[in-house]
């Protein structure tokens, strides 16, 4: 018997078996407008499951706008046309439960944004909002999430301390732990290491490489070295268009588009 408490979005997502599909998320004929200004005019991409895909390009090229469209973070400020396909659903359609969809497509922002709560509560708070109140369950998920974000050994004895007392790199990894606590399929990251020092950046990269065993990861970065180190695929954006998308090794050693080569080699602009 169907669970009548489930939304249509929940039922459709649960009915789709991702094991039968290599593509976790795709966009078709995607266009994004801020008023009359078109920020994305050619945004057709497919993201393979359990891979890291990097979105690169100059400032203002549209890569962050594109990323934020993937879980409809732009809904209030932009008009998005075209299809965003996830588990057989066009999640850009009006009948999608956006709140439920975001449980499956998580987001980590450029600057760490921990809650003004304890380390433990930063993760447990969202779980309680979803009806999970049993302490044993909360404890297990908090520990699992912190372990996956490579933080558990650093904070296991300080879970009741304020998250605001953590270093910038630790705060960002806590935000990653918070995002994965509800076990999304896909993790979106908008320049997650741009405000961090090299050591913290390396720790974030190592964390993402571990996480891709269980998550599909899409990351915006201005750091070419970072893209080449951690991503399996790279898309080059310019002026709101995806000019090239291929395996990262191919993009960095044998780009097919002159502008891609210019950007990677530092001769762009």
From Swiss-Prot:
The lineage of its organism: Bacteria, Bacillati, Bacillota, Bacilli, Lactobacillales. Its EC number is 7.3.2.1. It holds the Pfam family ABC_tran. It is an enzyme of class 7 (translocase). GO terms for molecular function: ATP binding; ATP hydrolysis activity; ATPase-coupled phosphate ion transmembrane transporter activity. It is found in: Cell membrane. This is Phosphate import ATP-binding protein PstB 1. The gene is pstB1. Part of the ABC transporter complex PstSACB involved in phosphate import. Responsible for energy coupling to the transport system. Residues 25-264 form the ABC transporter domain. Belongs to the ABC transporter superfamily. Phosphate importer (TC 3.A.1.7) family. Keywords: ATP-binding, Cell membrane, Membrane, Nucleotide-binding, Phosphate transport, Translocase, Transport. The complex is composed of two ATP-binding proteins (PstB), two transmembrane proteins (PstC and PstA) and a solute-binding protein (PstS). ATP binds at residues 57-64. SMART domains: AAA. It is a peripheral membrane protein. CDD domains: ABC_PstB_phosphate_transporter (cd03260). One of its GO terms (cellular component) is plasma membrane. InterPro entries: AAA+_ATPase, ABC_transporter-like_ATP-bd, ABC_transporter-like_CS, P-loop_NTPase, PstB-like. It comes from the Bacteria. It catalyses: phosphate(out) + ATP + H2O = ADP + 2 phosphate(in) + H(+). GO terms for biological process: phosphate ion transmembrane transport.
